[in-house]
Amino acid sequence: MEIGIAHYLTVSAILFTLGVFGIFLNRKNVIVILMSIELILLSVNLNFVAFSSQLGDMVGQVFALFVLTVAAAEAAIGLAILVVFFRNRGSIAVEDVNVMKG
């Protein structure tokens, strides 16, 4: 049995659904929301790589690497902001984030 594009798209759809459910079901914890966003980005990258492999074009794979780089930077900055916010406020609940001042 050969693994085709339908298998990759099925796994990607499952990852995307888990990410969306993670955002909607757990709106209280910012870390879970960030992890769910990363899961959604992973599913999008899997789609890029699957279609790029199917079409024999490298553009999708290069774009997936670009998205991974941006996602890593986003996660690092988001976690750094959360660490500073937790040190100042003592909580990382979503309700407390709206009191941040620029």
UniProtKB/Swiss-Prot annotation:
Q: Which UniProt keywords apply?
A: Cell inner membrane, Cell membrane, Membrane, NAD, Quinone, Translocase, Transmembrane, Transmembrane helix, Transport, Ubiquinone
Q: Which subcellular locations apply to this protein? A: Cell inner membrane
Q: Which reaction does it catalyse?
A: a quinone + NADH + 5 H(+)(in) = a quinol + NAD(+) + 4 H(+)(out)
Membrane topology of the entry: Multi-pass membrane protein
GO terms (molecular function) for this protein are: NADH:ubiquinone reductase (non-electrogenic) activity; quinone binding
Question: Does the entry feature the keyword Methyltransferase, yes or no?
Answer: no
- Residue ranges spanning the membrane: these are 5-25, 31-51, 66-86
InterPro entries attached to this UniProt entry: NADH_UbQ_OxRdtase_chain4L/K, NUOK/Mnh_C1-like
One Gene Ontology term from the biological process aspect of the record: ATP synthesis coupled electron transport
Source organism, top-level taxon: Bacteria
Instruction: List GO terms (cellular component aspect).
Output: NADH dehydrogenase complex; plasma membrane
Q: Does the keyword Endoplasmic reticulum apply?
A: no
Indicate the enzyme's highest-level EC class. Answer: translocase
The Enzyme Commission number assigned here is 7.1.1.-
Q: What does this protein do?
A: NDH-1 shuttles electrons from NADH, via FMN and iron-sulfur (Fe-S) centers, to quinones in the respiratory chain. The immediate electron acceptor for the enzyme in this species is believed to be ubiquinone. Couples the redox reaction to proton translocation (for every two electrons transferred, four hydrogen ions are translocated across the cytoplasmic membrane), and thus conserves the redox energy in a proton gradient.
| Subunit structure of this chain's protein | NDH-1 is composed of 14 different subunits. Subunits NuoA, H, J, K, L, M, N constitute the membrane sector of the complex.
Spell out the family assignment given in the record's similarity comment.
Belongs to the complex I subunit 4L family.
Fetch the PANTHER family from UniProt.
Answer: NADH DEHYDROGENASE SUBUNIT 4L-RELATED, NADH-UBIQUINONE OXIDOREDUCTASE SUBUNIT ND4L
Protein name from the UniProt record: NADH-quinone oxidoreductase subunit K
Q: Name its species.
A: Brucella anthropi (strain ATCC 49188 / DSM 6882 / CCUG 24695 / JCM 21032 / LMG 3331 / NBRC 15819 / NCTC 12168 / Alc 37)
